[in-house]
Amino acid sequence: MSEKAIAVKAQKVEEIADQFKAAASAVVVDPRGLTVAQSTELRHQLREEGVVLEVIKNKVLTRAAEKAGYAELNDIFAGPSAVAFSNDDAVAPARILKKFADENEALEIKGGVVDGTIANIDDINKYASLPSREGLLGQLMAEFQFSIRSFAYAVKAVQDKLEEESAAPAAEASTDAE
């Protein structure tokens, strides 16, 4: 192999290692058996959520994973491999790939990395069941809103009770004075 080809591969390993390090999650799949239309549809769904899917040679993946500190992933780099990288939403790749794999048996999820932790197939499936970041923030805001509303109602009830109690002695005092 020429020095130029070796330099190109070394640069590719560096790029993929940097993607692993920067990613909120990276999910590895076996795309064997997907038609061109299915592959295009999958890439489109992933791209809408800011996820990039790359088909990468296993040797490059192995070296990049080791360089990024994820040598445990090397066991899943058998057969064709594609990696879905997401820098923003750690759950998006798992959610989209799981849904797509359920609809298309040809796609097999192998495992990956989520928030710096090695994730097996079961872990990926658990992450896939979580709502998106925006969904979780919405749920959190709804809980805050409910708590604040409940507190406001409690304060209003105490205020009303105090007003009734202070109004009652004043009414008694005015009837006694007559």
Curated annotation (Swiss-Prot):
Pfam families, per database record? Ribosomal_L10 (PF00466)
Report the protein name in the record.
Large ribosomal subunit protein uL10
- Upper classification of the organism: Bacteria, Bacillati, Bacillota, Bacilli, Lactobacillales
Q: Tell me, what does this protein do in biology?
A: Forms part of the ribosomal stalk, playing a central role in the interaction of the ribosome with GTP-bound translation factors.
UniProt keywords (A-Z) are: Ribonucleoprotein, Ribosomal protein, RNA-binding, rRNA-binding
Alphabetical list of PANTHER family matching this protein: 39S RIBOSOMAL PROTEIN L10, MITOCHONDRIAL (PTHR11560)
The GO annotation for biological process reads:
translation
Organism per entry: Leuconostoc mesenteroides subsp. mesenteroides (strain ATCC 8293 / DSM 20343 / BCRC 11652 / CCM 1803 / JCM 6124 / NCDO 523 / NBRC 100496 / NCIMB 8023 / NCTC 12954 / NRRL B-1118 / 37Y)
CDD domains reported for this sequence: Ribosomal_L10 (cd05797)
Molecular function (GO) terms for this protein are: large ribosomal subunit rRNA binding
